[in-house]
């Protein structure tokens, strides 16, 4: 409470001092005004007089307001004195009332100060406006009423009316200020929510946004930014991945090689690179330089393959090649008029241009008959080897009609073929050797029907096959050796459902299931076991009596075949 009393005392002293100064100035002004008018020149008097009057009006407006403030302060100080000490009872309620009154007085004084300042600004601005441009200045309503009040009304009534109107004007001005704050904001505060507000608040929800911000999500970007993701790159960068490389790099894999390397697939390589022997390389023979030059591809016409071109050069012995083509075949006419036909580097014999048939003698002495480029000969062997073996071909594959062997070896081996595959009809062996081995084939695979062996080897074994696989049904062995060993097979795997899959003459018994060995035992020849070897052999001999008479049976079959 002491601090509150001290504050109010200071306020009261300040207002008293200000009232005393204002009264002193108001007393001295009427005396100083005539001196100013006297000292001024006649031209300056009319200009100074309105200014002086306006200042007097302002002082008159301010003076009653200050008197009211001082009166309220005096009353307030008297009430404080009447209250007494702060420790007396009821001081708490009184202090609250005093605070409320002090707040009200401070608000009134602040409002009066604001009104006075605004009136001064309005008067100064109305004087500085349009008179310099030749226009009549717009005077404030308060000034007109002030003049009329001098003529018709008293000064006190006029001042009170001015104060009321100024307070109304102050309230309207505050409303304008509030609307101004709402309608016209600074750019930073107006766009705090990242939007462009319109000029009026009525269209805040139906406003049209700016072009740049309205299309923020789907706007047309600038050329530089729009092409940032899918732009056409500059030529140097666009060609970085799929550019046409420079000639040295572009031709690194598929370049046009030099003549020596370009002819690498067709040139005659050296013996060391091809792995050939001197006997198998024709260009290593003693030939003239001109022919050797042709062999290496130095003389070409229209870049055709070497074998399609004849030689037009002249050998040292006087032979000349003629440019005559018949299916890669050309002729050579000697000086004595004899004609020699060539196919590439090979001399051909018995050439018939009509049928295009001829034969070539190979380096090993074999003769091969051709029809065009295919090995073929009608009713005669197409290949006759140097050792006497004869082979029949029909259009480049083994074949012979009338159930005759396609291969007749010099040792008596006979092999039958049908359409290039070893085979024979009517359940006859397709391969017969001089030692009595017979093999049955069907379409190039071991096969025989009617539960008969597909391989019969003398003194060794009988073998049953089905479509190239060792197989026999009805729980019978697929392999029977002459010595008595027996083996059971199912689809080329050792297998037997009941009993051992392998029975040897020495008494060894082995069980197999689908090619996997299960167990093995040895049977005694003296004691009676489940699988007596003697009983098995005797049973087999009863079923297959030709095992005992193998030699006579083999000779008989050879005579029949």
From Swiss-Prot:
Listed Basic residues bias regions: 135-156, 165-185
Superkingdom of the organism of origin: Viruses
Comp. bias regions, Basic and acidic residues: 103-131, 192-203, 211-247, 259-272
Similarity comment: Belongs to the mimivirus L41 family.
Region described as Disordered: spans on this chain: 20-42, 82-283
Species this protein is from: Acanthamoeba polyphaga mimivirus (APMV)
The protein's name: Uncharacterized protein R871
């Amino acid at each position: 409470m002491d601090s509150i009393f001290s504050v109010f005392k200071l306020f009261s002293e300040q207002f008293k001092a200000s009232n005393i100064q204002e009264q002193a100035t108001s007393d001295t002004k009427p005396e100083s005004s005539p001196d100013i008018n006297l000292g001024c020149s006649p031209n300056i008097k009319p200009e100074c007089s309105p200014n002086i009057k306006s200042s007097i009006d302002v002082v008159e407006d301010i003076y009653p307001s200050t008197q009211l403030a001082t009166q309220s302060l005096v009353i307030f100080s008297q009430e404080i004195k009447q209250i007494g000490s702060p420790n007396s009872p009821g001081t708490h309620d009184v202090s609250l009332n005093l605070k409320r009154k002090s707040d009200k007085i401070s608000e009134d004084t602040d409002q009066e100060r604001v009104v006075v300042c605004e009136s001064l600004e309005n008067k100064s601005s109305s004087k500085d406006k349009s008179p310099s441009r030749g226009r009549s200045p717009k005077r404030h309503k308060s000034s007109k009423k002030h003049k009329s009040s001098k003529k018709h009304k008293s000064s006190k009534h006029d001042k009170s009316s001015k104060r009321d109107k100024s307070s109304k004007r102050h309230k309207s001005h505050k409303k304008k200020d509030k609307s101004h704050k709402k309608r016209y904001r600074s750019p930073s505060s107006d766009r705090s929510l990242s939007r462009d507000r319109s000029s009026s608040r009525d269209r805040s929800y139906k406003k049209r946004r700016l072009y740049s911000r309205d299309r923020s999500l789907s706007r047309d970007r600038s050329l530089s930014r729009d092409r940032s993701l899918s732009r056409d790159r500059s030529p140097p960068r666009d060609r970085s991945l799929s550019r046409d490389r420079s000639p040295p790099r572009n031709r690194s894999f598929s370049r046009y090689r030099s003549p020596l390397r370009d002819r690498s697939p067709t040139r005659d390589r050296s013996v060391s690179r091809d792995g050939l022997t001197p006997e198998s390389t024709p260009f290593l023979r003693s030939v003239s330089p001109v022919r050797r030059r042709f062999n290496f591809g130095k003389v070409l016409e229209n870049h055709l393959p070497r074998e399609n071109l004849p030689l037009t050069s002249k050998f040292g012995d006087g032979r000349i090649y003629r440019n005559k083509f018949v299916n890669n075949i050309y002729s050579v006419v000697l000086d004595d008029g004899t004609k020699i036909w060539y196919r590439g580097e090979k001399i051909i014999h018995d050439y018939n241009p009509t049928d295009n048939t001829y034969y070539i003698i190979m380096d090993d002495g074999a003769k091969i008959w051709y029809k065009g480029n295919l090995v073929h000969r009608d009713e005669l062997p197409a290949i006759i080897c140097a050792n006497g073996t004869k082979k029949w071909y029909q259009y480049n594959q083994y074949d012979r009609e009338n159930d005759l062997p396609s291969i007749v070896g010099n040792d008596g081996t006979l092999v039958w073929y049908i359409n290039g595959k070893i085979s024979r009809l009517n359940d006859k062996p397709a391969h017969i050797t001089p030692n009595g081995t017979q093999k049955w084939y069907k379409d190039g695979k071991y096969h025989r029907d009617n539960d008969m062996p597909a391989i019969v080897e003398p003194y060794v074994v009988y073998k049953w096959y089905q479509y190239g696989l060792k197989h026999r049904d009805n729980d019978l062995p697929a392999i029977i050796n002459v010595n008595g060993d027996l083996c059971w097979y199912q689809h080329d795997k050792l297998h037997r459902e009941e009993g051992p899959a392998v029975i040897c003459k020495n008494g060894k018994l082995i069980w197999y299931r689908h090619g996997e060995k299960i167990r093995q035992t040895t049977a005694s020849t003296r004691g009676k076991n489940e699988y007596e070897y003697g009983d098995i052999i005797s049973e087999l001999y009863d079923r297959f009596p030709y095992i005992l008479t193998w030699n006579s049976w083999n000779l008989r079959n050879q005579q029949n075949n």
